[in-house]
Amino acid sequence: VTTPVNTSPADCAWGAFDNVAPWVLDPNNIAWEKRAIELRVSAQREVPVLTTPTRTPPVARLVVVVWVLSKALIPWFVKKKLKRFDSPEESRAYISLRMRKAVERLGSTYIKLGQIISSGEGLFPAELVNEFKLCRDQVPAVPFELVKKTIETELGKPLNEVFSFIDTTALAAASIAQVHLATLISGEEVVVKVQRPTVSKLVRKDLRVMAWLAPHLVGRIKVSALANPPALVELFAETIVEELDFRIEASNMLDVAKMLRELNQDRYIIPRPHPTLATQRVLVMQRVSGFKFDDVVGMKNAGIDTHSVIRTGMIAFMEGAMIYGVFHGDLHGGNLFVMPDGRTALLDFGIVGRLTGARRMAFLRLMLNATTNNVVGQVEALRDLGALPMDTDIHAVIKDLNLGDAAIDPTTLSGEELVKEVQRIVKALMGYGARMPKELMLYVKNMVFLDGAIARLAPE
């Protein structure tokens, strides 16, 4: 099948889309867009409801969670009491391995939580971070009969009235959804993202269990970043709830596309979501392909300038956050495809960082103060981002935590040093009981990824 194309699409004037278009998006005529904006607000309002401890949690799920975690923790606790570990590092490695296996057994919600912890380099123990990086988001695919049922229920039509072809084998299967290649009746080659059955109910049930358990763990975990478990649960809920409605993801795609066009970042493109085929559990989008972001050899053999790829990536990410207040919240090698012409396609918009008004200015102040060794300015900015109450005595906090200025030369500050300076302050504050602002967590996570990408794509 040859995909119908439009080689001078009007939507490229307002969004960073490919100039070869299977369809053209009219911003005034997108069936799900207005509803998606309402859903985003609704999801944000749901977070405090899900994270406020109830008198009685979902008992059946609580029993399962406690049983699985106990099986992971008790052998470690016994070995530690009997002094069977040769070093603290061996002890941390042992418990980290057991916790990772427990997380994988508990399923989608806990796998996602493990992935957030795995992005917390400099905040969580290195053994825990490294072990949770192995947390498998690749899970067994849902049988196609269930996928077919979900698609037909969501779109309100038999499968063969929407697609002339759909691959019954998933291209990828993750904890929240799986992806299938397909071709629309009208001939366009697409990717179909389908939510796993019951995952939405499971995530919400797990969040209620976490919210009930969290207050009982305060003061019991000797890890600075886990000093305030209820705040960590709230951060996690803010991150995952929006992922459960694909109309929000489709809207995120449009917002990032608008941001990139506004900033004239023409080396990055966003796949077009279909203007009508986006529902809570199904998202149809333009198919794109290219080199994986870490396929340096493949890109160089194709004549792609990898220095340009990473340079434009850093600029687009930092400008998006600091100038426009919108940025992709989950950069990793699987979410970026470098196309044969050197442009990069961004994928998977379930998590997007948003900074508006005073919060964006506070974020900008945080970064600027980090580059100039201004600890007072950093802590004030973090307070304004919501990490601390507004009436906090900043100087008293700095004194209590012994947060002296770091020995960093602002004139030679590298990206890695900037990230470590922010991590230093945030880690100390989290040990003090502060909450990690969602946008900061996403930003630091992306900076760590991009810093590693520089080492691979432009090592010199």
Region spans (language model):
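Conserved phosphate/pyrophosphate-binding and hydrolysis machinery centered on Walker-type P-loop NTPases
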Residues: 55-59, 89-96, 103-106, 118-125, ...
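Helix-rich C-lobe and terminal helical cap/extension of kinase-like folds
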Residues: 23-26, 44-59, 87-93, 234, ...
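Glycine-rich ATP phosphate-binding loop
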Residues: 181, 188-196
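Short acidic/polar mixed-charge low-complexity motifs
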Residues: 186-188, 343
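Conserved beta3 strand of the Hanks-type protein kinase catalytic N-lobe
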Residues: 182-183, 331
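N-terminal accessory/targeting segments that precede structured cores
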Residues: 1-178, 201-229
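ATP-dependent phospho-/nucleotidyl transfer catalytic cores
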Residues: 126, 133-140, 152, 200-205, ...
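Hydrophobic residue at the +6 position relative to the catalytic HRD Asp in the kinase catalytic loop
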Residues: 334-338
